[in-house]
From Swiss-Prot:
Regions crossing the membrane: 407-427
Pfam families per record: C1-set, ig, IgD_del_linker
Name used for this protein in its record: Immunoglobulin heavy constant delta
Limits of the Ig-like domain: 6-98, 175-263, 267-373
GO biological process: adaptive immune response; antibacterial humoral response; B cell receptor signaling pathway; complement activation, classical pathway; immune response; positive regulation of interleukin-1 production
Biased composition (Polar residues): 106-118
Function: Constant region of immunoglobulin heavy chains. Immunoglobulins, also known as antibodies, are membrane-bound or secreted glycoproteins produced by B lymphocytes. In the recognition phase of humoral immunity, the membrane-bound immunoglobulins serve as receptors which, upon binding of a specific antigen, trigger the clonal expansion and differentiation of B lymphocytes into immunoglobulins-secreting plasma cells. Secreted immunoglobulins mediate the effector phase of humoral immunity, which results in the elimination of bound antigens.
One GO location term (cellular component): extracellular space
Gene3D superfamilies: Immunoglobulins (2.60.40.10)
Gene name of this polypeptide: IGHD
Organism for this UniProt entry: Homo sapiens
Length: 430
């Protein structure tokens, strides 16, 4: 098994309010670690406390588990904060802090008790209604005695432990634009989170029918906070999703009615209508970087993919920053932008940068390109501004190249003229 840090869970004894002369038992459950050997130390504040640590046990999955407990008088427990510090040879320490819970006795006397109910239903209080009928002196005494007995019973009876289980939550993730365009696939992910998922089962339906393939079941995962999660993935051809086929994920659990989530492509989709690529230039030193701004607008829904290419090679995502598409003013469509950082190259060799945009309603990839010679831009003292690729208010790189060619030709002819004049003069002198 690979190296794994332990998961640490704090445990406190019972729900009954302890008496002043009875101890409080605290425990740390350390589980799911590999390799073996952990060190457990208890502290009250900064002072270590004597504890009892049980032998390690190897689970069926080859990971280890152990537990450690501390017993302390109630009065001492209320005086400070207790910590269980776990050190694993292959990972960093984990600390769990114990806090004294609210008194169960106070809870029982201040609110009526309720029987546990299924999630989503109403719980009915079980307190008896007060009797208003006059029953005479003997009846009043019996009534007082009965009320006294009921009060004593409420004070001595152990209340129900509060449930800390996490309710099941189901989430359905629709296909990412990257998968739709780069893989020509529509991948759906159904995700469930809860406290006890060993009997949970996720199923799929495509247009009301069970798919015959393309389903990938994930393993049950246990997390450090005590919760569990499980997922299932369904992969379909992109054409089915574009055709508006409905996809349904259903969670089946023995203790709950089936929970269904449906994904359906938005029918009123609109492809982008405008794409622009602007140059952001500044008068920074030659070693500084330049910036390109790609803007796209007029699309719906907001799921869109903006990528950058440098000479037909994909740029790493760490080199540019996309923005989450906001809605356009007084419109049902969205707009987005991405800023690319172009580092100054060591040589004046120009590079072509392309902004590629894909949307689920576009039949083709939109793109806009710009050829940059960054060293020339950095050495030219320009006022910071935004220039559109279609405007003519700046010197193009083709013009710059022609200028250098003309100048080189002039210098070469001038040198040849000098050589010719020198040779003729030398012949005449001889």
């Amino acid at each position: 098994a690979p190296t794994k840090a332990p998961d640490v869970f704090p445990i406190i004894s019972g729900c009954r309010h302890p008496k002043d002369n009875s101890p409080v038992v605290l425990a740390c459950l350390i589980t799911g670690y590999h390799p073996t050997s952990v060190t457990v130390t208890w502290y009250m504040g900064t002072q270590s406390q004597p504890q009892r640590t049980f032998p390690e046990i190897q689970r069926r999955d080859s990971y280890y588990m152990t537990s450690s407990q501390l017993s302390t008088p109630l009065q001492q427990w209320r005086q400070g904060e207790y910590k269980c510090v776990v050190q694993h040879t292959a990972s960093k320490s984990k600390k769990e802090i114990f806090r004294w819970p609210e008194s169960p006795k106070a809870q029982a006397s201040s609110v009526p008790t309720a029987q546990p109910q299924a999630e989503g239903s109403l719980a009915k209080a079980t307190t008896a209604p007060a009797t208003t009928r006059n029953t005479g002196r003997g009846g009043e005494e019996k009534k007082k005695e009965k009320e006294k007995e009921e009060q004593e019973e409420r004070e001595t009876k152990t209340p129900e432990c509060p449930s800390h289980t996490q309710p099941l939550g189901v989430y359905l993730l629709t296909p990412a634009v990257q998968d739709l365009w780069l893989r020509d696939k529509a991948t759906f992910t159904c995700f469930v989170v809860g406290s006890d998922l060993k009997d949970a089962h996720l199923t799929w339906e495509v247009a009301g029918k069970v798919p015959t393939g393309g389903v990938e079941e994930g393993l049950l995962e246990r997390h450090s906070n005590g919760s569990q999660s499980q997922h299932s993935r369904l992969t379909l051809p992109r054409s089915l999703w574009n055709a508006g086929t409905s996809v349904t994920c259903t969670l089946n659990h023995p203790s709950l009615p089936p929970q269904r989530l449906m994904a359906l492509r938005e029918p009123a989709a609109q492809a982008p209508v405008k794409l622009s690529l602007n140059l952001l230039a500044s008068s920074d030193p030659p070693e500084a970087a330049s910036w390109l701004l790609c803007e796209v607008s007029g699309f719906s829904p907001p799921n869109i993919l903006l990528m950058w290419l440098e000479d037909q090679r994909e740029v790493n995502t760490s080199g540019f920053a996309p923005a989450r598409p906001p809605p356009q003013p007084r419109s049902t469509t969205f707009w987005a932008w991405s800023v690319l950082r172009v580092p100054a190259p060591p040589s004046p060799q120009p590079a072509t940068y392309t902004c590629v945009v894909s949307h689920e309603d576009s039949r083709t990839l939109l793109n806009a390109s710009r050829s940059l010679e960054v060293s020339y831009l950095a050495m030219t003292p320009l006022i910071p501004q935004s220039k559109d690729e279609n405007s003519d208010d700046y010197t193009t790189f083709d013009d710059v190249g022609s200028l250098w060619t003309t100048l080189s030709t002039f210098v070469a002819l001038f040198i040849l003229t000098l050589l010719y004049s020198g040779i003729v003069t030398f012949i005449k002198v001889k």
